[in-house]
């Protein structure tokens, strides 16, 4: 069953100020839950306040948004196992598909919102200590014997899967597709990993607060937040090749239909594409999907970095099966 396309309908209803008649809108307050991945805490803390004002202005109703954060794969599993989410805003398409496979999201969710339901993007960079004492410039520096690496566990973290694939893309180019050499490179990289945290924020804590390692492989936004908070302690290195990381959003159909929150949940995700929210994303160091607004942040982001995409890996289903499923390449190289 194809997913009901309500975005335009909701927008037109709100724009025309048509009287709200549904039972849930008739109440003074509505509550929804956004189950998200690890490093979106600051983004949604700011966005939820803005959205509440928008919803109140358009409908007269107050909305309270409860947040849940953790490693993206773990969060998807929690929702599939019963954590009630009106919306999911996860690190990658595959994790939303896992919720769909559990029967909670209808087919066609990726076409529900613009840009394949990805309102903002990011990429993968290195966070190093001020002065870059180990001289880290590119992925090959991460396999040196004296370099301690921090990155999350790709079995539980969406960001960690983007990290792994970005490293693979670099090795693929360096070794002209020689899979044995690529695997050896990835094996050496993960041999240097000091701790595999379950999520990106945990990895940041290990590196920034606990002082572990020489380099953190990180979401771009997470690295910028660390530099913002500790400008005298850290700096960012952008590798020669990285990956276009595309977080995905979706309404959890089974939950909103049960609670009667489809309208507010849909508008919650739809409003992520508004100019106001696109700038909130940029201010929180996510790359806005709106190209014109992205250009406003040209002094913040390296817009010329060489980015591969998940399509270069055959899409998420193939990438997951090849690299991250039980017995996949990651298990093979990490357990050796």
Where are these regions (language model features)?
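Bacterial N-terminal signal peptides that target proteins for export
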Residues: 1-9, 19
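A conserved helix-loop-strand patch within extracytoplasmic ligand-binding domains
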Residues: 100-173
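Extracellular/periplasmic juxtamembrane helices and adjacent flexible linkers that interface
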Residues: 256-336
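Alpha-to-beta junction loops
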Residues: 82-88, 146-148, 209-218
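Solvent-exposed loop/turn segments at secondary-structure junctions
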Residues: 39-42, 72-75, 93-97, 131-134, ...
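C-terminal segment of classical bacterial N-terminal signal peptides
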Residues: 15-23
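Early extracytoplasmic/lumenal segment of secretory-pathway proteins
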Residues: 24-102, 112-113, 219
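Ligand-binding pocket segment of bilobal, Venus flytrap-like solute-binding proteins
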Residues: 174-241
